Design a protein with these regions (language model features):
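A generic structural signal for alpha->beta connector loops
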Residues: 12-14, 98, 136
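Amphipathic terminal alpha-helices
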Residues: 142-153
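Conserved beta-strand segments of alpha/beta enzyme cores
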Residues: 14-16, 72, 138
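Alpha-helical substrate-binding/gating segment
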Residues: 32-41, 47-82
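Conserved beta-loop-beta element that borders a ligand/cofactor-binding pocket
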Residues: 4-26
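Conserved C-terminal active-site "lid" loop/helix of NAD(P)H-dependent oxidoreductases
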Residues: 83-89, 113-138
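Alpha-helical membrane-targeting segments
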Residues: 29-52, 93-126
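Mid/C-terminal beta-alpha module of Rossmann-like enzyme folds, strongest
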Residues: 61, 65-116, 149
Length: 153
């Protein structure tokens, strides 16, 4: 809530700040599954959280926030917590990958290659959409499995 106060110029205007996880679309899933098929290592730690959201839920929440006159900060991430490892293994499952493993780049190499940007890969936030759910928004794809099933068709 503090972060939206700096944008408040007029008292009668509602401000919505969206904190959006990795947006899942068909093109992204196809690209990630190609990386896994070629056994290209994934940057980050396998135990880190991987906040994600289906693109249709972003559109759905924006429409919901307008029609419900919401204001404040909202986390737009899937309602189930997902680790890096379970995220990529789920992609393998839904894309029917023949490679049974996911390789992760060691943290020191990630820091070397990406510098300060490495924090994005190494420290996945444990983000839950509590306020989003409390706003009565109903996710179209609340679980990773439902999102991937839709994007794998």
């Amino acid at each position: 809530e503090k972060s939206t106060k700096i944008f408040r110029v007029f008292e009668d205007i509602d401000i919505i700040q969206l904190r959006i996880g990795v947006v899942l679309r068909k093109k992204i899933i196809n690209l990630l599954s190609l990386n896994l098929l070629l056994s290209i290592p994934v940057p980050g730690r396998k135990n880190n959280y991987f906040p994600w959201i289906h693109v249709d839920d972003i559109v759905g929440f924006v429409n919901h926030s307008i029609s419900s006159n919401l204001n404040g900060a909202f986390n737009l991430v899937g309602s189930e917590l997902t680790s890096h490892e379970s995220f990529f293994k789920s992609i393998q499952k839904y894309k029917k990958s023949i490679i049974p493993w996911v390789l992760f780049i060691p943290p020191n190499l990630v820091k070397l290659f990406f510098g300060k940007m490495s924090e994005m890969f190494l420290y996945g936030p444990k983000t839950k959409p509590i306020k989003t759910l409390n706003s009565k928004y109903k996710f179209k794809y609340p679980t990773l499995q439902e999102a991937l099933l839709n994007l794998s068709e």
